[in-house]
Amino acid sequence: YVVPWNSPKIANILPQLECQCKNCKEPLLLFGRFTEMTEHVQKLFRYRNFITVSSNSWWDYLYAKERFLTLEGRQLNGKRNFNKRFNKAYPNAEFIPLNPSTIPMARAFLEKWYKSRGDMDEGLIAERDAINLAFEHWDDFELIGGILKEGDSVFGFTYGSGVYEDIFAVHIEKADRNIVGAYPALAVALAKMLPEKYK
C-alpha cells in the first residue's frame, strides 16, 4: 500500500490495512519515500519488528505537474498525440470528481474492465480488492480522483493521494483500452484537478 503519511488518521488506517493483509495471509507491504516512510513506521510501530527495503525496481517515475498539464517535450510526444486524438473523438468528455456519490459509477466500470481481461490471476484479484478497500475508505484515505466520461459512457477513472507536502502519488489508472487516448486524457485531467500545493 501507499499510504498518506501526513494524514491525522494514519494511526487508525494502518491497523485496518494490517488486518486486511492478515485475512488474506499476506504481509503488510508499505511503499513510499524510503527515509520518510521508515521514520513514520518507527514512530507508529515502536514496539514491532519490521523490515525496510529500498529497491529501484519498485521506484516510480516522478513528474512535475506542469508537464502533465501541457504534455510538452519530446518525452511526452506520444501521450500528447493520443490525448489530442481522444479530445477530438470525444469533445464533450468530462472529468468528474470521484467521491462517495460517484464511486458506484467507477465500481461498475471496474467490473467491466476486469471482465474484459478474462481470467483473474492473484495480482488482479489483489488489485481489485485494494481498489474496493480504497472506495470503502475514500474519505479516511483522503484520496483525490475522477471519472472520465461522456454522457452515460465511462472511459476510465484514476485516483491517488498526497504522499508528501508537495508530492501526489497516482495509485490507480483504469481506462478502456479500446478508447484511443483515454489513459493520457485521465492523466491530464487529474493534473488539472489537483490542488495547487502539489507540484
Listing of model-derived features with the role each one plays in the protein:
Residues 1-36, 149-178:
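Conserved donor-binding loop and adjoining core beta-sheet/short helix segment
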Residues 14-25, 185-198:
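Conserved acyl-CoA
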Residues 26-45, 56-59:
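Short, glycine/charge-rich beta-strand/loop segments that flank catalytic centers
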Residues 27-33, 62, 94-98, 147:
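A structural signal for short, well-ordered beta-strand segments and their strand-loop junctions
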Residues 46-119:
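Acyltransferase donor/substrate-recognition loop-hinge adjacent to the catalytic core
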Residues 123-142:
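Active-site rim helix/loop that mediates acceptor-substrate recognition in acyltransferases
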Residues 135-136, 142-156:
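Conserved beta-hairpin
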Residues 179-183:
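Short glycine/threonine-rich catalytic loop with a Thr-x-Gly-x-Asp
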